[in-house]
Amino acid sequence: MTSTFNPRECKLSKQEGQNYGFFLRIEKDTEGHLVRVVEKCSPAEKAGLQDGDRVLRINGVFVDKEEHMQVVDLVRKSGNSVTLLVLDGDSYEKAVKTRVDLKELGQSQKEQGLSDNILSPVMNGGVQTWTQPRLCYLVKEGGSYGFSLKTVQGKKGVYMTDITPQGVAMRAGVLADDHLIEVNGENVEDASHEEVVEKVKKSGSRVMFLLVDKETDKRHVEQKIQFKRETASLKLLPHQPRIVEMKKGSNGYGFYLRAGSEQKGQIIKDIDSGSPAEEAGLKNNDLVVAVNGESVETLDHDSVVEMIRKGGDQTSLLVVDKETDNMYRLAHFSPFLYYQSQELPNGSVKEAPAPTPTSLEVSSPPDTTEEVDHKPKLCRLAKGENGYGFHLNAIRGLPGSFIKEVQKGGPADLAGLEDEDVIIEVNGVNVLDEPYEKVVDRIQSSGKNVTLLVCGKKAYDYFQAKKIPIVSSLADPLDTPPDSKEGIVVESNHDSHMAKERAHSTASHSSSNSEDTEM
């Protein structure tokens, strides 16, 4: 049976900074990891990749049934060359329909044994193991989580032990000897046993762990590889965001979008009976996380409405209900990470943006004044006649951009910006690792308004020392627009396309030590 199918081996090579020139994605109601949008004359086209191909193996690793983010990560880690084993779309669908073992295609028996168990989850001697960090959400039952914490002589960190059979921890996916990386979004790799126990106690009746299993932890220590929290598996979480796709009806989509009061962000309200919104599964009080694949977590009400309208006669929303939102906030993860794990363009094999949760439910009350004071700030600026009224500065050779020379009474001053504030996000996009010029361009391209997440120098140093991700949810929410209580109907007779004005005139100068642009 397998001899009737002919997979192709495609070897792609690119230059540093170049893209492979294709998209790797998954699609609704379509099986497999699909190759899409193969660019003309790109490394992908030259290697023989075609639109609709399904990726079976990456560098010999069988990936057909693995999570999309893991497949993306394998390509990303391949550097400037990667070998893909692919099957054309028609053959793939026939193979699936006739239940052909896709692992056997294009592989000798010897090759099959090399690396099929690299990706997670796999069964190893009856025990499930993983090769990436994973989030586990525990809700206490009968006053117990069903686990204990231990330290191991000669090893740094705290580990899971005494897992109660069929207890809360086991059902949540916790394994014996798991290395505990985070408690409620806070890194605890350098914390003592007593400190970790105290954090878990303070968490109350629910807690979120970021864990890695024993074997994976051992490999990372031996290879001196640091875990990236944004690669964490969300598979074990009991509540997940929902992707809602709608086509506009004669009376619009049939819902109101309202700025939340208790809940930060934009909330779905007053869904019309029988409307496209109701039929697509949208629910009252859903929080909008993304519109047509773009995060809207830090955008204001009018901007989100405009993004929906720009979608024309159809739109795709990533939404969460209150329970799911609270769970993700506890982990300091954005629900947008779920969208990225489902479908991520990978022609450029780009890094996933740093998580930017919409809001944060504090898992334990701060017990010191120091913790209360350490907050980032969300600042919304409206451009004046002379720009935004601040200079953007960066130290050559060092990451990060920061605020200088805030003009008294200017837009930046009125929005709460201060000298030495470090810029974390521009319009919801994390820019900490972006070059100075790109940060400048993002601000200038924002038109007449820009939303910045910034952090004072002392607070920034504190978060860095504690390994706490700086996210918008830690900041106080922006003021709710005065008309938000009335709601805005997203419907067909409002389809204006507001062109964003790009600022062309900026005063700038540079020296041997810094680069400085007036906004």
Swiss-Prot record:
Residues with Phosphothreonine modification: 451
Keyword Zinc-finger: no
Domain PDZ: 9-90, 134-215, 243-323, 378-458
InterPro entries reported in the protein's UniProt record: NHER, PDZ, PDZ_sf
One BP term from GO: positive regulation of protein localization to membrane
Short name of one Pfam family: PDZ
Gene3D superfamilies: 2.30.42.10
GO cellular component, one term: microvillus membrane
Residue stretches of biased makeup (Polar residues): 357-367
Ranges annotated as biased composition (Low complexity): 505-519
Chain spans, region Disordered: 347-374, 479-519
Family annotation (PROSITE patterns): PDZ (PS50106)
SMART domains, sorted: PDZ
Biased segments, Basic and acidic residues type: 482-504
Keywords: Cell membrane, Membrane, Phosphoprotein, Repeat
Stretches assigned to coiled coil: none
Signal peptide: none
Protein location: Membrane; Cell membrane
Keyword Cell inner membrane recorded: no
Molecular functions per Gene Ontology: PDZ domain binding; protein-containing complex binding; protein-membrane adaptor activity; scavenger receptor binding; signaling receptor binding; transporter activator activity
Tissue expression notes: Expression is limited to epithelial cells. Expressed in the kidney (brush border of proximal tubule), pancreas, liver, and small intestine. Expressed at a lower level in the adrenal cortex, testis and stomach. Overexpressed in breast, renal and lung carcinomas.
Superkingdom of origin organism: Eukaryota
Family note: Belongs to the NHER family.
Domain comment as written in the entry: The PDZ 2 and 3 domains seem to be involved in the interaction with SLC26A3.
Annotated function: A scaffold protein that connects plasma membrane proteins and regulatory components, regulating their surface expression in epithelial cells apical domains. May be involved in the coordination of a diverse range of regulatory processes for ion transport and second messenger cascades. In complex with NHERF1, may cluster proteins that are functionally dependent in a mutual fashion and modulate the trafficking and the activity of the associated membrane proteins. May play a role in the cellular mechanisms associated with multidrug resistance through its interaction with ABCC2 and PDZK1IP1.
Protein name: Na(+)/H(+) exchange regulatory cofactor NHE-RF3
Organism, scientific name: Homo sapiens
